[in-house]
Amino acid sequence: MAAKDVKFGNDARVKMLRGVNVLADAVKVTLGPKGRNVVLDKSFGAPTITKDGVSVAREIELEDKFENMGAQMVKEVASKANDAAGDGTTTATVLAQAIVNEGLKAVAAGMNPMDLKRGIDKAVLAAVEELKALSVPCSDSKAIAQVGTISANSDETVGKLIAEVDKVGKEGVITVEDGTGLEDELDVVEGMQFDRGYLSPYFINKPDTGAVELESPFILLADKKISNIREMLPVLEAVAKAGKPLVIIAEDVEGEALATLVVNTMRGIVKVAAVKAPGFGDRRKAMLQDIATLTGGTVISEEIGMELEKATLEDLGQAKRVVINKDTTTIIDGVGEESAIQGRVAQIRKQIEEATSDYDREKLQERVAKVAGGVAVIKVGAATEVEMKEKKARVDDALHATRAAVEEGVVAGGGVALVRVAAKLAGLTGQNEDQNVGIKVALRAMEAPLRQIVSNAGEEPSVVANNVKAGDGNYGYNAATEEYGNMIDFGILDPTKVTRSALQYAASVAGLMITTECMVTDLPKSDAPDLGAAGGMGGMGGMGGMM
């Protein structure tokens, strides 16, 4: 086992604090509308330019192992805030730095660290309740656009784009992709879309678009390969009599069956299109069941004793329209019952809660979106790859922030909400004097985000903080325009969830750091002695010394 280097008391805390400050100072320059960029070197390719706090934090590793431990603990604050709310990472880092610095000063002055931590925890619990009381619902697209704009570093075009995304609803899946031009674009897919196209180009009935478009078709869902046309004849005859088109979604349609369907389509006997079912294995079975729920049909599966020959029109699903191209199939307005669809969504949600891997969770979330919401794709436009990466990170932050805003509402932005909360809790007391100091440490730290935003804007933090504290309600300082007023009227909003998560995670990790008394790390390995000069002729295995 490697030898360890151990530091105690003030020695340990000073080293840890240095690491905290290095990381936090690098991250906090990005805060606010006038925050600066940070350039991150990459081992290959162009450097990354970012204004995203967590991206900066993730890049920082310090040479001194004790300092690095402090930096890594603050990195954890940023990561946790990012995981919980998808934004607010810089605010969380600034809060953590403020609590650690103030807290360690109190420890150095002789306060009991455990009581300090209890005081901080008490203040944060009370602050979370106050934040909830200040929160107002965020439902209209104007407020959503404002939240998106603030989170995307005051980029109004991104804010407006994200406000349009509410077309896919709360359950919708939103993906961010590289665009092809300089402008940002938004594609919204109505209905259920999956990534499987037609099995034969002969099904195409819209040559100008290269797509198959079928109005009010029946939809046959089969969890098996179909190669024998005899199995399908009863269904095909029933569909032909009904005078409607047919879409077949099966594990595969091949050989004689596919050839016969193509011939029937080309002769105009019955309009048919066949596609492979999406997914593989158990996921394919589940997705077929999703489509069945959406279209009011039944999956023909031999596992439950159903045979294709005995299928009737009652077993088929229906939709208002189906569009199939080379790579995708979109089912629009399935006729499934709303209660059945909601039941299916609830079932998938339960699976999301029980899922252990991020991959499974993501795939299940996509299924919820396809059944209940829709899919929106934001295509980010930029002139260079470096700009594209930076912009995608901002769009991603804005997306998470707007989701958080819809979930828990919004509070006044620009650090004002935390200043108001701190003022309301000024009379809060603990069980002893040391806990009272802990409460004051937390309340003083709540001013740090406002002070940092002002500092990044080139103004004097103390002057602005005092002016803001002299006001009440949503009165604050707009760093972008350098004027005071109602932050809600200015359109400067923060999602309550983002502010709450930032405060909770910052206090949690900072409290642990304040109560640290000892740090242990591996001693750096001393270089092994150079054995290249030892006796022995090359290739003689050390026998040279025997001659």
Curated annotation (Swiss-Prot):
It holds the Pfam family Cpn60_TCP1. InterPro entries: Chaperonin_Cpn60_CS, Cpn60/GroEL, Cpn60/GroEL/TCP-1, GroEL-like_apical_dom_sf, GROEL-like_equatorial_sf, TCP-1-like_intermed_sf. It is an enzyme of class 5 (isomerase). Transmembrane segments: none annotated. GO terms for molecular function: ATP binding; ATP-dependent protein folding chaperone; isomerase activity; unfolded protein binding. Keywords: ATP-binding, Chaperone, Cytoplasm, Isomerase, Nucleotide-binding, Stress response. It comes from the Bacteria. PROSITE patterns: CHAPERONINS_CPN60. It catalyses: ATP + H2O + a folded polypeptide = ADP + phosphate + an unfolded polypeptide. Together with its co-chaperonin GroES, plays an essential role in assisting protein folding. The GroEL-GroES system forms a nano-cage that allows encapsulation of the non-native substrate proteins and provides a physical environment optimized to promote and accelerate protein folding. Forms a cylinder of 14 subunits composed of two heptameric rings stacked back-to-back. Interacts with the co-chaperonin GroES. Belongs to the chaperonin (HSP60) family. This is Chaperonin GroEL. It comes from Klebsiella pneumoniae.
